[in-house]
């Protein structure tokens, strides 16, 4: 059987959603104080782990994060992140970003083609894995700290573990 708790440790949350939750957590830059989640397997009879998950995270300074993830969607789509903030909203998907300020100002950008390298992967997977791996190797070769430290990586891993602890009701 593929997709087991023993071998993979989880499904959509640990494999796919972790990246978006990590990015949103980085934007929020605060300590999570409560996590509510619900995980289930709705569409994959050949795996036992989660293929659907949603949750709500509350942070110390008052920010909140809502997330929804699934890997039983009918087609492959880019990830979307939407931020609603005091002074406006931000939207990111694939290689596009847009900020709409409350005063009507709009900033938008599209990742330049020279910055996007997929290395034979599917384009909706994104391209940051390659950059992070290259930075890690460069940090080892040049005896410096990587852009993303182990300490930062541990923070998101602990948050993902808390999502699993609070959300595995359907798997008990």
Give, region by region, the residue ranges found by the protein language model.
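Phosphate/oxyanion-binding loops and surfaces in catalytic or ligand/nucleic-acid-binding neighborhoods
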Residues: 27-31, 86-90, 163-170
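A structural signal for well-ordered alpha-helical segments within the folded catalytic domains
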Residues: 18-22, 127-134, 151-158
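Short beta-strand scaffold segments in enzyme catalytic cores
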Residues: 55-57
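NAD(P)-dinucleotide binding in Rossmann-like oxidoreductases
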Residues: 45-50, 60-131
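Internal, well-ordered alpha-helical segments in soluble enzyme and binding-protein domains
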Residues: 19-23, 31, 51, 79, ...
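C-terminal helix-rich "cap/oligomerization" subdomain common to oxidoreductases
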Residues: 60, 135-172
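Predominantly a Rossmann-like dinucleotide-binding segment in NAD(P)-dependent oxidoreductases
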Residues: 1-46
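Active-site rim elements
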Residues: 9-11, 120-124, 142-146
